[in-house]
UniProtKB/Swiss-Prot annotation:
Protein family: Belongs to the RNA polymerase beta' chain family. RpoC2 subfamily.
Cofactor stoichiometry and binding remark: Binds 1 Zn(2+) ion per subunit.
Enzyme class: transferase
Full protein name: DNA-directed RNA polymerase subunit beta''
Gene Ontology molecular-function annotations: DNA binding; DNA-directed RNA polymerase activity; zinc ion binding
Cofactor: Zn(2+)
Pfam families attached to this UniProt entry: RNA_pol_Rpb1_4, RNA_pol_Rpb1_5
Subcellular location: Plastid, Chloroplast
Organism: Draba nemorosa (Woodland whitlowgrass)
Gene: rpoC2
Length: 1381
């Protein structure tokens, strides 16, 4: 022993790691025997001190970390900010989830790192601290849950639970945290027992594969090796892993530093030599591994290396295979036990960041980066190659190199502070992660109408599907609105843009006169311009017919033809109509009947060919009761201009209307009641009741007849069929399917006596049960159709007309399809037939391109009497009337190409009055392609909010007073493409055309040119280009009525005028919450601008949802979504949870070579990089052999890395050589292919790779085969010993097959000798006769190498074995790689 003076004295705490180092140094200096004696003394000393100290563990020893409070508070603040960004639509759900995980995981990790210094400073002899860090019991993760926080939990599938547990076990858990903890932990005796059995079975399978691997030789003579380098192409290998990989190995080549050889071939590596390699910075070191051993059924000493037990080369006869199987399988039991202790705590990882070394300005080449979004939704730049970033300070310039595929988080010329994060390094593509593709479903949080921008693919993914794909990042919007009950949809007479009251249990048509604003106002004129140029803006015609009055998209004019047709004065001169119409004041004085002609004018005044100009509902064709329409023998033709039309991207959908060709149809009446699902029905199905019978508690029947009750989704439909019931004989033939109409004279009401019928009847077969049926004879109403409008009377011939281009045609339409039910609400009548006037004009050669006419409202003043007319004339160009809405290019907001398409078109409109509740709203109508009935969305004042744009308290009253001086200013410039104005704060908003007085109206309204006059606050000037100049320095906003845009002005006090500004608020624009439109102005909520007015804007509330490329949108544009409906599906790739319970299944998955659930998204890029190296070896001799070797070697390295990654993530240290022995066995077989039939092996036969090479060399014949990857189970059933195979699985099949083939078992392995009771052929003391003598002269083997081998020897070493991780993905080797000898 060394002298006492030379001993080193250490005065510090020795933990488990220090003990390991101490033992290692003792073994190196004193050997095994003396080291064991020293350690025995250390053990005795430890027990004595522990007894004297009398350490006990109590609850008071669990000390919470002081910094936990502010760390948790900071994490909550970050989560709150993240929640706000998600609410504003800046990040989507997946980005929010990822960032939330990292926030809480980082907080938990900080607490865990603070735990050890806290104990060390406050109480170094704390029992919990000494227990956890001595390695005796518990670890840092478990103690962290006691004194830190439990953090995020995993569910049984390994997915993260979004709610973190902030408490620790010392503080106690709340009820919610306890339930999450129980759900996440899901531990118990059964789970632990199952995991333990899995670990034991894994160990058994591993031992089955390698039980015959015994050290039989000293040197196999191989010249191959695997290169290990601390600096790989893709990433740096940590020094600790580098040392663990090299220690105990044997060099395959000499190591030179400069010209001096520092290590020789076949020299084993110790810690001293490895440290010297690290110090001198050796680039690559070639080592021998079990992969490179040339022995087939055993292994040599030099390829195995040092024995971990003795620290010397492994001895001959050592059963290293069983040691390897036990070394891998036994930690699986530890994983199971550790699972129970940790309890499902989620573990993850954080990205590596690059920070600025000091303050300075960032400089980099912007051409080498591309803008993108990080996985957290933050804006960043992506660099594809190494990017040099220069940080310029006052006195120094620092250069930072950002590796490829990293995110740059700062902009060019941005000033950064010291330690600020400037880049985020993405993990290299070669690093293996268990990734999986996950679907994240986003559900609608509210009820409303779905909108999206032009970024969404409007064509569905599949035919007849409602799934749309996103080509790039965009917003989805749920516009607020309440839907009416589904039971009332079919019977509703409301159309798009109708004003109504909610609920609408009883509906009656009301005059438009209720919408007048003030009785003392001038006659209201309806005129506006279309704000879109379809040809210029690139937007298809979504806003052709846009509403301007509070009733609909159309202007409804009730003409004066209600009593006599001659009251309508019609003049046709110069290819135009002049039709007078009434003003609202005139309508208020006299009662308007509902049976008059309703003239429909689009808002832009443009009629296309065959479009409906007016319609007339004849009261003779109205019914108050519900029923079914029949006209089976009629011929129905669809016309060009359909009545209910919805235009959207991708096509047009029409609700068909039928043109009558025969003047008779039939109506079969029935009484229908739609009841809620919870209603109490007091009658039975198929029963007969009389008139005024109580059906429910508050409903009585209007007619008598047969009761039919049908229960549907969330409602009950009760029908009463009036008529007679007959029970026919078997001889009567009654249609089984639908009813039949029987004309008069053919009736047979009684089989014994025949009787002629006077009227039509409807015979219907009703089957209450399978065997019984009866016939219901129902009365039928017959309708004859006659011409109700005489065009000659309406529009008399005009002697002064020049050409008769424009004409009106009369069409009669049946509003319901054949066999379709008609439904009425309460006392509302049902219109069966509608007479429509359709505009048409002749096409000549000069005007062949004219496809539209324009209608204008004009006013003619004669002797103080004002008459209003409609002028209809052919127009050649509508560019002068249609203005393109455009935002200035510097506005930074949505351009005209991104404006959403606006609402659909419905010609009919009614105003509904409800006396029950005064909740006013507007109907939005949608047609669902899958449903016959339309659905309604009611937009009420609760879904919108008004924001005043002038909120300066100092000048607010002045503005209000100036508005009150002129009552015309209160008439708001409204609406535009978005349709009806909403009643908010009892203020109606329409009438875009204003006149100053009755006498001067003709000056502003000319016949040939419509001159638009508008009213703005006097201090604003708007020129013809829309540029705004403000002479009042106290206001900062101005409305441009022609474009319906708000301009916010920045004042210039030096010149006393305002500069030209960009558009901030436009009609129809979507914007997210927290948008600050100007200084001292309110922050707007998210929504869509519905109305733009002089002093305020009305915004429809909307909820934005951000979606990234590849997401799938469920539902069509403008479809009604209910709360909880699936809105978007995100498909993203995430790393599988690092939960410790998943460790054992991952190892088993890799060893059994099972295919993973989904392939990594970047697998294609990896294969491309892999193929680049393959091209270097094509076209040279022995290329097939190299291809097979390449496949096998790279798959071996990949498998070793995967298994090591799993165990290292759990803190389990396993030497690579153990895993290499296992992987060598499952990759040592090749599959003989059918090409190039061989006389030796059968196609599909599994043979060893070395055997195939030697056989081909001996026969001088090329044997075609391909590499195959076997699992440990298949490898156990494909060995040289059938006794070993039969003792594992499938005993009968294996023995029968071996007997038929005449297989011979040479009993070389351990297991077959155990089965037969022989001596185990292993052990260092075994008979030396079985141990093969090693070859002392390797030069003999070198001389036997052929010249061909020398051709590619260097390439083999460089190409195949230089990179440690070449192809890191979970692959099944099925690629055909033929080897030719």
């Amino acid at each position: 022993m060394a002298e006492r003076a030379n001993l080193v004295f250490h005065n510090k705490v020795i933990d488990g790691t220090a003990i390991k180092r101490l033992i290692s140094r003792l073994i190196d200096h004193f050997g095994m025997a003396y080291t064991s004696h020293i350690l025995d003394q250390v053990k005795t000393l430890g027990f004595q001190q522990a007894t004297a100290t009398s350490i006990s563990l109590g609850i008071d020893d669990l000390l919470t970390i002081p910094s936990k409070g502010w760390l948790v508070q900071d994490a909550e603040q970050q989560s709150l900010i993240l929640e706000k960004h998600h609410h504003y639509g800046n990040v989507h759900a997946v980005e929010k989830l990822r960032q939330s995980i990292e926030i809480w995981y980082a907080t938990s990790e900080y607490l865990r790192q603070e735990m050890n210094p806290n104990f060390r400073m406050t109480d170094p002899f704390n029992p919990v601290h000494m227990m956890s860090f001595s390695g005796a019991r518990g670890n840092a993760s478990q103690v962290h849950q006691l004194v830190g926080m439990r953090g995020l939990m995993s569910d049984p599938q390994g997915q993260m639970i979004d709610l973190p547990i902030q408490s620790n076990l010392r503080e106690g858990l709340s009820l919610t945290e306890y339930i999450i903890s129980c759900y996440g932990a899901r531990k118990g005796v059964v789970d632990t027992a199952v995991r333990t059995s899995d670990a034991g079975y894994l160990t058994r399978r591993l031992v089955e594969v390698v039980q015959h691997i015994v050290v039989r030789r000293t040197d196999c003579g191989t010249i191959r090796g695997i290169s290990v380098s601390p600096r790989n192409k893709n990433r740096m290998m940590s020094e600790r892993i580098f040392i663990q990989t090299l220690i105990g190995r044997v060099l395959a080549d000499d190591i030179y530093i400069g010209s001096r050889c520092v290590a020789f071939r076949n020299q084993d590596l110790g810690i001293g030599l490895v440290n010297r390699f690290i110090t001198f910075g050796t680039q690559s070191i070639s080592i021998r591994t079990p992969f490179t051993c040339r022995s087939t059924s055993w292994i040599c000493r030099l390829c195995y290396g040092r024995s971990p037990t003795h620290g010397d080369l492994v001895e001959l006869g050592e059963a290293v295979g069983i040691i390897a199987g036990q070394s891998i399988g036994e930690p699986g039991t530890q994983l199971t036990l550790r699972t129970f202790h940790t309890g499902g705590v989620f573990t993850g990882g954080t990205a590596e960041h690059v920070r600025a070394p000091y303050n300075g300005k960032i400089k980099f080449n912007e051409d080498l980066v591309h803008p993108t979004r990080t996985r957290h939704g933050h804006p960043a730049f992506l660099c594809y190659i190494d990017l040099s970033v220069i940080i310029e300070s006052d006195d120094i310039i620092h250069n930072v190199t950002i590796p490829p595929k990293s995110f740059l988080l700062v902009q060019n010329d941005q000033y950064v502070e010291s330690e600020q994060v400037i880049a985020e390094i993405r993990e290299g593509a070669s690093t293996f992660h268990f990734k999986e593709r996950v679907r994240k479903y986003i559900y609608s949080g509210s009820e409303g109408e779905m909108h999206w921008s032009t970024d969404v693919s409007h064509a569905p993914e599949f035919t007849y599907s409602n799934v749309h794909l996103l080509p790039k990042t965009s917003h989805l919007w749920i516009l607020s609105g309440g839907s009416c009950g589904s039971s009332l949809i079919r019977f509703s007479i409301h159309k798009d843009q109708d004003q109504m009251n909610i609920p609408f249990l009883s509906a009656q048509i009301k005059s438009i006169s209720s919408l007048s604003v003030n009785n003392d106002q001038v006659s209201q004129k309806f005129c506006s311009s279309d704000f879109y140029d379809k040809k210029k803006s690139g937007i298809t015609d979504y806003s052709e017919l846009n509403g301007i009055v509070g009733t609909s998209h159309y202007n409804f004019i009730y003409s004066t033809i209600f009593h006599e047709n001659s009251d309508l004065l019609a003049k046709r001169r110069r290819n135009r109509f002049l039709i007078p119409f009434q003003s609202i004041q005139e309508q208020e004085k006299e009662f308007i009947r509902h049976s008059g002609i309703s003239i429909e004018i689009p808002i832009n005044g443009i009629f296309r060919r065959n479009s409906i100009f007016a319609f007339f509902d004849d009261p003779r064709y109205r019914r108050k009761s519900s029923g079914i329409l029949k006209y089976g023998t009629l011929r129905a033709d669809s016309i060009i201009q359909k009545e209910d039309m919805i235009e959207y991207r991708g096509g047009q959908k029409f609700k068909t209307k039928y043109e009558m060709k025969v003047d008779r149809f039939f109506f079969i009446p029935e009484e229908v009641h739609i009841l809620p699902e919870s209603s109490v029905i007091m009658v039975q199905n198929y029963s007969i009741i009389g008139v005024n019978t109580r059906i429910t508690l508050n409903i009585r029947s209007q007619v008598g007849g047969l009761i039919r009750v049908e229960r549907k989704k969330k409602r009950i439909e009760l029908k009463i069929f009036s008529g007679d019931i007959h029970f026919p004989d078997k001889t009567d033939k009654i249609s089984r399917h639908s009813g039949i109409l029987i004309p008069p004279g053919r009736g047979k009401t009684n089989p014994k006596e025949s009787k002629k019928l006077k009227n039509w009847i409807y015979v219907q077969r009703i089957t209450p049960t399978k065997k019984k049926f009866f016939v219901l004879v129902r009365p039928v109403g017959t309708y004859e159709i006659a011409n109700s409008i005489n065009l000659a009377t309406l529009f008399p011939q005009d002697l002064f007309r020049e050409k008769d281009n424009i004409e009106l045609r009369v069409f009669n339409y049946i509003l319901y399809g054949n066999g379709k039910p008609t439904r009425g609400i309460s006392d509302t009548s049902i219109q069966l037939v509608r007479t429509c006037l359709v505009l048409n004009w002749d096409q000549d050669t000069k005007n062949s391109s004219l496809e539209e006419v324009r209608a204008f409202f004009i006013e003619v003043s004669t002797k103080g009497l004002i008459r209003d007319f409609i002028r209809i004339g052919l127009v050649k160009s509508h560019i002068s009337y249609i203005r393109k809405r455009n935002n200035p290019p510097d506005s930074g907001l949505i351009s005209a190409d991104h404006i959403n398409p606006f609402y659909s078109i419905s010609p009919k409109a009614f105003i509904l009055q409800q006396s029950l509740r005064q909740n006013h709203g507007t109907v939005r109508m949608f047609l669902n392609s899958n449903k016959e009935s339309p659905s309604l969305l009611i937009l009420s004042s609760s879904n919108c909010f008004r924001i005043g744009l002038f909120n300066h308290v100092k000048y607010h009253n002045v503005i209000n007073q100036s508005i009150k001086k002129n009552p015309l200013i209160t008439i708001k410039n409204s609406s535009g493409p978005l349709g009806t104005a909403i009643q908010i704060s009892n203020c109606y908003s329409f009438l875009p055309l204003l006149t100053y007085n009755k006498i001067s109206a003709i000056k502003y309204l000319q016949l040939d040119k419509v001159k638009y006059s508008f009213q703005v606050i006097n201090s604003y000037l708007i020129d013809e280009n829309g540029r705004s100049f403000n002479l009042d320095r106290y206001s900062n906003g101005v409305l441009n009525p022609l474009k319906l845009n708000w301009y916010f002005l920045h004042q210039n006090y030096y010149h006393n005028y305002c500069e030209e500004t960009s558009t901030i608020i436009s009609l129809g624009q979507f914007f997210c919450e927290n948008l600050c439109i100007a200084k001292k102005e309110p922050h707007l909520k998210s929504g869509q601008v519905l109305i733009v007015q002089k002093d305020s804007i009305v915004i429809r509330s909307a909820k934005p949802y951000l979606a990234t490329p590849g997401a799938k949108v469920h539902g069509h544009y403008r479809e009604i979504l209910y709360e909880g409906d699936t809105l978007v599906t995100f498909i993203y790739e995430k790393s599988r949870s690092g939960d410790i319970t998943q460790g054992l299944p991952k190892v088993e998955q890799v060893l059994e070579v099972r295919s993973i659930d989904s392939i990594s998204l970047n697998l294609e890029k990896r294969i491309k990089g892999w193929n680049k190296c393959i091209t270097r070896i094509l076209g040279i001799p022995w290329g097939f052999l190299i291809g097979a070797e390449l496949t096998i070697v790279q798959s071996r390295i990949s498998l070793v890395n995967k298994i090591q990654k799993v165990y290292r993530s759990q803190g389990v240290q396993i030497h690579n050589r153990h895993i290499e022995i296992i992987v060598r066995q499952i990759t040592s077989k090749v599959l003989v292919s059918e090409e190039g039939m061989s006389n030796v092996f059968l196609p599909g036969e599994l043979i060893g790779l070395l055997r195939a090479e030697r056989t081909g060399r001996a026969l001088e014949e090329a044997i075609c085969y391909r590499a195959i990857l076997l699992g440990i189970t298949r490898a156990s059933l494909n060995t040289q010993s059938f006794i070993s195979e039969a003792s594992f699985q499938e005993t009968a099949r294996v023995l029968a097959k071996a007997a038929l083939r005449g297989r011979i078992d040479w009993l070389k392995g351990l297991k077959e000798n155990v089965v037969l009771g022989g001596m185990i052929p292993a052990g260092t003391g075994f008979n030396k006769g079985l141990v093969h003598c090693s070859r002392q002269h390797t030069n003999t083997l070198l001389e036997k190498r052929t010249k061909n081998l020398s051709l590619f020897e260097g390439d083999m070493k460089d190409i195949l074995f230089y990179h440690r991780e070449f192809f890191d993905s979970s692959i099944s080797i099925s690629k055909s790689s033929f080897s030719r000898i």
